[in-house]
UniProtKB/Swiss-Prot annotation:
Pfam families: MCM, MCM4_WHD, MCM_lid, MCM_N, MCM_OB. GO terms for biological process: cell cycle DNA replication; DNA replication; DNA strand elongation involved in DNA replication; double-strand break repair via break-induced replication; mitotic DNA replication initiation; regulation of DNA-templated DNA replication initiation. The gene is mcm4-a. This is DNA replication licensing factor mcm4-A. A zinc finger (C4-type) spans 301-326. ATP 2 binds at residues 466, 511-512, 613.
Length: 858
């Protein structure tokens, strides 16, 4: 690196190449009207280019753009001494933002200023005679420096931010968002105290607070984030180490602004937003693997072994062409294991459905996260992203330096915020301690102690839907879920804790409304429709990565809703191949993939809430559930609860339903709020129970479950029917655990088993009742046929066998003649389907075979 002090003749030669008039004192700084491109011999990429103001303007000028001077530099800025940490970390390394350059802001949109080199700040007091006077004190030096191309006076900006941190008190602050803080004291001073205690050097700044405190400072942050944020870093570190001089942090405190007022819809981003701070929202649909990105390259001369370091500027490495020690050209070689790298991750963000205009497909944008922001979000998360909008050129050919005129855009992430006010709180390791205050937990526990809490929570679920109390209770237990059990260390594997529910019945009975309500409530919910879903759309598909051109796995709806609920409407209209992928997910909670050389097993710990309509558009009470919705029995047996939602066609019911619907339109909001539990309380209640309550089976509850299962088996054994399978016992265990979670109980008790048994029995009464006998027969769901139907089929086969034997040794019979003989012999009505079933039963016994219209004996 060249010396910061230069001879007057050298400085004059630089002025001759790009002369600019001096900037008047006190006026707003403007970008120079003209400045020709600097040649390669002026300075290296790691140096500051002097501004053409005065001969004294480049003497020991400190660096205030994104990175501070390299730690290998001989001259350190005086301002760097205010903190025990070195301000040598570029913003691209710590915030995910590339180093400060000269492109992007309105004053920099000129073709002749396209250099990516760092530039020195403008010296407003260029008429001072001596360099010694310029560096007399830190204060006098800071007040004279404005970052080139902006109106950001570094000293004033730093002073304003320090005043903001030390004085700002939010009058509209809520206790839920500021857990453990005194709202009458400066918020961000308490945040710095948290940093001292916890040791995480990140200070999140709400831009709304900054805007209410200082409009001009907020405007500078939005317009020039890559210059202002490092200044904020310096100010925050100075305050912190003045208060806590003995504190030791991993690295300097990084300020992370969020909630920028310049919140943009993803499709409305345009060139005027480039290099500005923006906040957008969406759903993460894909994350890449971690990519190492070089931040500082290490070069070694192959002749004299002289070494030098070069910092990377926006992905460009400026290899030194001449060794400064021996003056040998093209002798510098890059040493990879001595270079510095940082973590980088590419994230694809998709537009939220609620932000999409009518008739449009969702837009996607690319995010780049760096260092500790890597792996902060997973596919399926809904996030608000604050970052800097970037535009980078695309080369016509990788081997040619020419670039296209159309640029490629992305967002460098500064801050993630996983919040959605309409949904349940998604609890992760970073937020679980801050989510619930002691006061909030006390309110929730007081609510849990009430005897009617189960009914109150069920009534608060979809209050606009009339009646269906048992169905709402079943969905409520699905939201709570059972206790996750892992016995893999004992060789027994994992047992699923998720509850699967199927709603089937007449059209217009609020099935889809219930699905939409649950989808909008849970944080990792996915909503799909039967005809609009394919097997790969539900599971995973292989595609080429646009960056690396390698085959990668894209996850589908079931994997994206891991630890959530997947709502599937029109379940009966799914293709057979699409439904087949659900078998493994609904029982083993995993998804096995073997495609295009990619063999893996993905987690799909999701609850399935499905809705199906009958084949004949209206439920036929004379048919079984299998015959009505035409779903395979192997799939139906995996649902814990199957509810029928039928239209009773009763005048009294119709009158009550109409009164309820009309009341939704004329009742005031206050009346509706008084009737039902507060929505925020419901969300907190479910989130707390899912996170902290893990009930275990007690001795009494275990005995009650055993008795319930034995009784269910005993009911069917007398009539030759099976009324329960081990899957029904596991369903009872999950429902009992979920009911214990509703009570915030750490132990499953007898009342939980009784409610689970009642709910399970109510569901079976509707879905597993034999229409001919009116008796519950679980084999309808497990084998697709009731015990009476199976018995009738066997009896008819034996009658047909005797009829054939009575005809002597005739080797073949006509199909129609045999059918008419059987109908004439039997008193009961025999349909052609029943006759075919009897023939198939005898064919399975190798007694006969059917070829065309002829029945031949074997």
């Amino acid at each position: 690196m060249s010396s910061p002090t230069s001879t007057p003749s050298r400085r004059k030669s630089k002025r001759g190449r790009g002369s600019n008039p001096p900037t008047p004192r006190g006026e707003e700084v403007q970008s120079p009207p003209s400045q020709k491109r600097r040649t390669e011999d002026s300075t290296s990429i790691g140096e500051l280019l002097p501004m053409p103001t005065s001969p004294s303007g480049d003497i020991q000028s400190p660096l205030f753009s994104s990175p501070a001077p390299s730690r290998h530099s001989a001259h350190q800025s005086e301002l760097d001494l205010s903190s025990p940490l070195t301000y040598g970390t570029p913003s691209s390394r710590v915030e995910g933002t590339p180093r400060s350059g000269i492109r992007g802001t309105p004053a920099r949109q000129r073709a002749d200023l396209g250099s990516a080199r760092k530039v020195k700040q403008v010296d407003l007091h260029s008429d001072q005679p001596a360099a010694e006077e310029l560096v007399t004190s830190e204060q006098s030096l800071g007040q004279k420096l404005v970052i080139w191309g902006t109106d950001v006076n570094v000293a004033i900006c730093k002073e304003k931010f320090q005043r903001f941190v030390q004085r700002f008190i939010d009058p509209l602050a809520k206790e839920e968002e500021n857990v453990g803080l005194d709202l009458n004291e400066p918020i961000y001073m308490q945040r710095l105290e948290e940093i001292n205690v916890v040791g995480e050097p990140f200070l999140n700044i709400d831009c709304d607070h900054l805007r209410s405190f200082d409009q001009d400072l907020y405007r500078q942050l939005v317009c020039y984030p890559q210059e202002v944020i490092p200044t904020f870093d310096m100010a925050a570190n100075e305050i912190f180490f003045e208060r806590y001089p003995d504190s030791i942090l991993e690295h300097q405190i990084q300020v992370r602004p969020y909630n920028a007022l310049k919140t943009r819809n993803m499709r409305s981003l345009n060139p005027e937003d480039i290099d500005q701070l923006i906040t957008i929202s969406g759903m993460v649909i894909r994350t890449s693997q971690i990519i190492p990105e070089m931040q500082e390259s290490f070069f070694k001369c192959q002749v004299c072994a002289f070494t030098t370091r070069v910092e990377i500027d926006r992905g460009r490495i400026a290899e030194p062409s001449v060794c400064k020690h021996c003056n040998t050209t093209h002798s510098m070689a890059l040493i990879h294991n001595r270079s510095m790298f940082s973590d980088k991750q590419m994230i694809k963000l998709q537009e939220s459905p609620e932000d999409m205009p009518a008739g449009q497909t969702p837009h996607t944008t690319i995010l780049y996260a760096h260092n500790d922001l890597v792996d902060k979000v997973q596919p399926g998360d809904r996030v608000n992203v604050t970052g800097i909008y970037r535009a980078v050129p695309i080369r016509v050919n990788p081997r040619v330096r020419n670039v296209k005129s159309v640029y490629k855009t992305h967002i460098d992430v500064i801050h993630y915020r996983k919040t959605d006010s309409k949904r349940l709180h998604g609890i992760d390791e970073d937020t679980e301690q801050k989510m619930f205050t002691e006061e909030r937990v006390a309110v929730l526990k007081e609510l849990a102690a009430k005897p009617d809490i189960y009914e109150r929570l069920a009534a608060a679920l979809a209050p606009s839907i009339y009646e269906h109390e048992d169905i709402k209770k079943g969905i409520l237990l699905q939201l709570f879920g059972g206790t996750r059990k892992d016995f893999s260390h004992t060789g027994r594997g994992k047992f699923r804790a998720e509850v699967n529910i199927l709603l089937c019945g007449d059209p217009g009975t609020s099935k889809s409304q219930l699905l939409q309500y649950v989808y909008n409530l849970v944080p990792r919910g996915q909503y799909t429709s039967g005809k609009g879903s394919s097997a790969v759309g539900l599971t995973a598909y292989v595609m080429k990565d646009p960056e690396t051109r390698q085959l990668v796995l894209q996850t589908g709806a079931l994997v994206l809703s891991d630890n959530g609920i997947c709502c599937i409407d029109e379940f009966d209209k799914m293709n057979e191949s699409t439904r087949s992928v659900l078998h493994e997910v609904m029982e083993q909670q995993t998804l096995s993939i073997a495609k295009a050389g990619i063999i893996c097993q993905l987690n799909a710990r999701t609850s399935v809430l499905a809705a199906a309509n009958p084949v004949e558009s209206q439920w036929n009470p004379k048919k079984t559930t299998i015959e009505n919705i035409q779903l395979p029995h192997t799939l139906l047996s995996r649902f814990d609860l199957i509810f029928l939602m039928l239209d009773p066609q009763d005048e009294t019911y119709d009158r009550r339903l109409a009164h309820h619907l009309v009341a939704l339109y004329y009742q005031s909001e206050e009346q509706l709020k008084e009737e039902h539990l507060d929505m925020a309380v419901l969300k907190d209640y479910i989130a707390y129970a899912r996170t902290y309550v893990n009930p275990r089976l007690g001795e009494e509850a275990s005995q009650a479950l055993i008795e319930a299962y034995v009784d269910m088996r005993k009911i069917g054994s007398g009539r030759g029917m099976v009324s329960a399978y081990p899957r029904q016992l596991e369903s009872l265990i999950r429902l009992s655990e979920a009911h214990a979670k509703v009570r915030f109980s750490s132990k499953v008790e007898t009342i939980d088993v009784e409610e689970a048994k009642r709910l399970h029995r109510e569901a079976l009464k509707q879905s597993a009742t034999d229409p001919r006998t009116g008796i519950v027969d679980i084999s309808i769901l497990t084998t697709g046929m009731s015990a009476t139907a199976r018995k009738r089929k066997e009896e008819l086969a034996q009658v047909l066998k005797k009829l054939i034997q009575s005809k002597g040794k005739t080797p073949a019979f006509k199909y129609q003649q045999l059918f008419e003989d059987l109908r004439g012999q039997s008193d009961a009505a025999i349909t052609k389907d029943m006759f075919d079933e009897a023939l198939h039963a005898l064919a399975d016994e190798d007694y006969l075979t059917v070829t065309g219209k002829t029945v031949r004996l074997l």
